[in-house]
Amino acid sequence: MANFLTKNFVWILAAGVGVWFYQKADNAAKTATKPIADFLAELQFLVNGSNYVKFPNAGFVLTRDALQDDFIAYDDRIKAWLGTHDRHKDFLAEILDHERRVKPVYRKLIGNIIDASTIRAASGVEL
């Protein structure tokens, strides 16, 4: 084993350096292309006349995979919920605390739809 390492140390080191450089280049490319991709998506919305999908009825499903282990909602899920209906902001303000954690009274709604009637049934709060 020592003979193998002695003979191939340079190649192993070169492979490690190559992987490190690849990761650095990949991260730099992602950083540079993300704003460009977002701009092109917005431009496509303008050209096609399309826009983000909006639901006609307020409500979303609060799934367990949208939450961390400590019941904190992921930022990307919150952004998605907020983008699909204007009333979702009120729903999220009611069911999440200041740390974006689902309040204990609403944890029984995980896996179900969140709308005005389920919030009223769970806590008595009228939205």
Curated annotation (Swiss-Prot):
The keyword Metal-binding does not apply. Keywords: Capsid inner membrane protein, Membrane, Virion. GO terms for cellular component: membrane; viral inner membrane; virion membrane. It is found in: Virion membrane. It comes from the Viruses. This is Protein P6. It comes from Pseudoalteromonas phage PM2. The lineage of its organism: Viruses, Varidnaviria, Bamfordvirae, Preplasmiviricota, Tectiliviricetes.
